[in-house]
């Protein structure tokens, strides 16, 4: 409610009017992009906007749509994150960026080899794997350059010179290089192709201007759970300044602005272990000044948004006997790696390396409902689905006169048509069978396949 959408639209239009940008682009979540286009059109009824529909990005229409962007002088091009990911990027630029990443990995490997006995095999193996992955990506790009045809329009040819990224935290998983592969909490250094694709696009614009310009990130959760996310913001938006400060990788940045400590923590099996983490920022005034150069920060209080106070209630639900039994098995599995304890085949060599991830995945599913692990488990009156259905029914009766509507979310066990047991369908079953709520009054958003159906 702080006005991000309108700010994006006004900023894009004013940049065009003042010749600060010739062809700006706005990208947003699929669920929000139609609202962004409508807001822009309402603010500027005479603006020439190109809004990408799902039909425009079908295989048959995509090439024509890309040529449309290239050959026309639009005030703004608006599309979703997913659609943006389908735009080809300049192979030559990809080659340069991937080669720079590979050079950094090779430098790190050389440093580790010189350290000799002080380096673990796991650390060396991690960097060698990263080197292999980058070499494979480079080969793929080199092949794309050799086999390229003239009819492919890439992002560079489209002439986009400023990009506004709504909900930019969706692209936070960008690749980075580090020798600290055993330090907890750094995230996945390999990153995602989605984030790498965004880096290619931003670098295309920055190379054209020769400045740290051309991209605006908008988000309510810029940094959520890792200090690497702050470094990656600078990697996206301030490459020239990082280079000026001779910061060419995460380790160089962390050496200046972060402090690593070793503390004792409880692990998954409830044992105390030593954990190495970057726990503190240092040189905070300098880091804050660096961050403020690229940031405009607003809270709902700053803007004066009138919002109701959140009434958050945490319900503590004790585990069922089956869950308590499974927790003990899970702890034994985490210690021994004996997968038969969980009713599955022994772990392969690859699975053995990911043992703790497997344990965490089982723990998440078990905490929601034992039937997430095996549908043959019995229902239990004290599981979360039962408690949830009971509370929904109570609110249903309480606000029946007002025809109140409730939203129910779960990050696991979402509804999939014809896909066996899931917690959404189980809650609906309990509401209809145990509490007499008409089935027609409980709907799944997943049943709505179009924007029109969702709004209805």
Task: Give residue spans per PLM region.
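A solvent-exposed, charged loop/short amphipathic helix patch at secondary-structure junctions
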Residues: 95-121, 176-191
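Conserved Walker A/P-loop ATP-binding site and its immediately adjacent core
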Residues: 7-10, 20-43, 48-49, 56, ...
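Conserved helicase motor
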Residues: 51-62, 81-86, 411-413, 441-454
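Conserved Helicase C-terminal RecA-like lobe
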Residues: 1-12, 16-20, 305-456
């Amino acid at each position: 409610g702080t006005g991000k959408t309108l700010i994006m639209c006004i900023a894009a239009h004013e940049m065009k009017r003042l010749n600060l940008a010739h062809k700006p682009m706005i990208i947003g979540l699929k669920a929000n992009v139609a609202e962004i286009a409508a807001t822009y059109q309402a603010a500027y009824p005479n603006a020439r906007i190109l809004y990408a529909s799902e039909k425009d990005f079908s295989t048959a229409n995509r090439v024509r749509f890309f040529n449309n962007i290239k050959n026309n002088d639009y005030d703004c091009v608006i599309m979703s994150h997913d659609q943006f990911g389908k735009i080809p990027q300049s192979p030559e630029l990809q080659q340069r960026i991937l080669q720079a990443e590979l050079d950094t990995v090779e430098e790190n490997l050389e440093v580790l080899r010189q350290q000799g006995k002080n380096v673990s095999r796991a650390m060396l193996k991690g960097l060698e794997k990263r080197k292999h992955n980058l070499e494979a990506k480079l080969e793929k790009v080199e092949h794309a350059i050799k086999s390229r045809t003239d009819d492919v329009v890439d992002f560079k040819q489209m002439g986009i010179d400023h990009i506004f990224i709504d909900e930019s935290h969706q692209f936070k998983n960008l690749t980075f290089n580090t020798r600290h592969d055993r330090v907890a909490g750094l995230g996945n250094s390999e990153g995602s192709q989605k984030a790498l694709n965004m880096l290619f696009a931003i670098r295309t614009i920055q190379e054209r201007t020769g400045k740290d310009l051309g991209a605006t990130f908008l988000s309510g959760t810029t940094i959520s759970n890792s200090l690497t996310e702050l470094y990656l913001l600078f990697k996206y938006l301030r490459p020239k300044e990082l280079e000026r400060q001779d910061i060419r990788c995460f380790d160089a940045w962390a050496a200046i602005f972060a402090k690593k400590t070793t503390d004792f923590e409880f692990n998954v099996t409830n044992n105390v272990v030593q954990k190495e983490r970057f726990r503190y920022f240092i040189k905070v005034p300098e880091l804050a000044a660096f961050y403020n150069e690229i940031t405009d920060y607003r809270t709902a209080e700053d803007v004066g948004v009138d919002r109701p106070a959140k009434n958050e209630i945490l319900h503590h639900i004790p585990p069922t006997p089956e869950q308590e039994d499974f927790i003990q098995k899970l702890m034994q599995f985490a210690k021994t790696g004996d997968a038969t304890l969980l009713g599955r085949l022994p772990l392969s060599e690859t699975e053995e390396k990911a043992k703790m991830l497997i344990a965490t995945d089982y723990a998440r599913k078990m905490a929601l409902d034992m039937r997430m692990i095996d549908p043959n488990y019995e229902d239990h009156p004290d599981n979360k689905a039962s408690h949830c259905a009971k509370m929904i029914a109570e609110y249903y009766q309480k606000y029946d006169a007002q025809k109140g509507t409730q939203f129910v979310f779960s990050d696991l066990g979402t509804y999939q048509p014809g896909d066996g047991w899931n917690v959404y369908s189980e809650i609906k079953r309990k509401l209809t069978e145990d509490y007499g709520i008409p089935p027609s009054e409980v709907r799944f958003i997943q049943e709505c396949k179009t924007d029109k159906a969702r709004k209805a």
